[in-house]
């Protein structure tokens, strides 16, 4: 059984999660999660990964406009940006590119820790219903 961006949103896995761009990509399957802050080695990003970031890398609009198309071309499932550290909202250039490419961008509030994100997502992705592994295997 697969787990998708749609599932993440509609099962309310993380409170106050918002889909802000790339709505047409909600069917993208999530097979893994990756916490990233510096995307200087995009070849280390795998297809069907859901990226979590504080948005540090996106502060410099001109330098990083190419990242959304690059991530979409690598078949990344989508990106979740934790607002409140480096970004208070998702920049318009990111929303526009993500919508054009059906690349989902979601936001979570600052009070949801990456530790909580990893624990919850690993439970989901490695649950008996998804892969045959159980929580005790983690």
Task: Explain the meaning of each model-derived region.
Residues 1-138:
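Alpha-helical/coil-rich non-catalytic "connector" segments in signaling and regulatory proteins
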């Amino acid at each position: 059984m697969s787990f998708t961006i749609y599932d993440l949103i509609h099962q309310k896995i993380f409170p106050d999660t918002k889909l802000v761009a790339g709505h047409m990509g909600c069917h993208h399957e999530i097979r893994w999660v990756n916490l990233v802050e510096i995307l200087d080695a995009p070849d280390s990003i795998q297809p069907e990964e859901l990226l979590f970031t504080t948005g540090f890398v996106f502060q410099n609009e001109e330098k990083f406009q190419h990242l959304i198309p690059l991530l979409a071309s690598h078949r990344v499932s989508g990106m979740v940006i934790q607002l409140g550290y480096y970004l208070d909202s998702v920049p318009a250039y990111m929303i526009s590119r993500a919508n054009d490419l059906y690349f989902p961008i979601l936001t979570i509030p600052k009070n949801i820790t990456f530790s909580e994100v990893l624990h919850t997502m690993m439970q989901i992705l490695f649950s008996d219903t998804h892969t045959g592994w159980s929580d005790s295997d983690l």
